Swiss-Prot record:
This is Probable secreted beta-glucosidase SUN4. It is found in: Secreted, Cell wall. The lineage of its organism: Eukaryota, Fungi, Dikarya, Ascomycota, Saccharomycotina. Present with 24700 molecules/cell in log phase SD medium. Induction: Expression is decreased during transition to slow growing or stationary phases. The keyword Glycoprotein applies. Glycosylated.
Amino acid sequence: MKLSATTLTAASLIGYSTIVSALPYAADIDTGCTTTAHGSHQHKRAVAVTYVYETVTVDKNGQTVTPTSTEASSTVASTTTLISESSVTKSSSKVASSSESTEQIATTSSSAQTTLTSSETSTSESSVPISTSGSASTSSAASSATGSIYGDLADFSGPYEKFEDGTIPCGQFPSGQGVIPISWLDEGGWSGVENTDTSTGGSCKEGSYCSYACQPGMSKTQWPSDQPSDGRSIGGLLCKDGYLYRSNTDTDYLCEWGVDAAYVVSELSNDVAICRTDYPGTENMVIPTYVQAGDSLPLTVVDQDTYYTWQGLKTSAQYYVNNAGISVEDACVWGSSSSGVGNWAPLNFGAGSSDGVAYLSLIPNPNNGNALNFNVKIVAADDSSTVNGECIYENGSFSGGSDGCTVSVTAGKAKFVLYN
């Protein structure tokens, strides 16, 4: 998805921290196709699509903040959902009636480009290891890159080896030190490739920015400070003279740990694919937090005070939560209206931290009104943790109303509990 730089602000939050979350929802797309590269289906550019950012702002106590309030507060956050025009039409009365708790930013895109990967790509003969124990549990996918989707680092430990510019060929995926391959996209392990002609997909080639995923709990560190003026975001390593170079030389490592504030804990008998958007970058929802039955994994909570900003606004980590029992290869892709996966998954997570307070959200996906086949609640991880507010998704309904819910974590950690 490409967002233009023309932004209309319907309301403003003076004195509060406004945070933009990257949640790319599919809209009506011109069916004319220009290219198909390595399993990534590209549609025509210059498609006019209207999107709306719907922002719910809460303070550190998990309470909704009225945008016009004069209350002094230095620690608040906004959970922002990007909604397609068709969804806004259906819910416009609701948005208008809840103006005290939402901020709307209407953005017109003149170059909406979507990369779609069909679920059929999961049927190739190669395999990608997904086992947390490093044993023989595998899932089918196609790629020359190797490595587990759970990474090689212990939680919140490392990385230890610095990345050396100009030493790894563009055709070689740099697995390790937290970097994990996305094998099912058929792009050599990369989570997305942005080319010099503004197209996306294919191999990592000269002049392209080649984006990558990091293991659960981590985020990539690489994106150029000079971003496009048309609202697109660029992220990843730069392919130059046949070799990979950092686009952000302020750090020596390709992955960094987020704030140690949230875990996903499964009480289910089936695995669940939670797919983060690749942002900054193509916004493919392909970065996996694949929680196996009865297991737990850290959920990346980005430090919004130091992480990527979009046109001066802080950004948070955003996730698509798929129904239990769907493989990671079939779930962490661009889906279709009938698939119920990827950008059509029933639920979104949001996670970010500012001024030492973590904000965690459950957010409805307007693309899919069906209930998830399990429930989710955000609760304190232990007695020493402090979680303000209530946030429960049960049988398709939210404790905070139809717009979802947000909690703040002021001490310790929270857990997203998946249960029946």
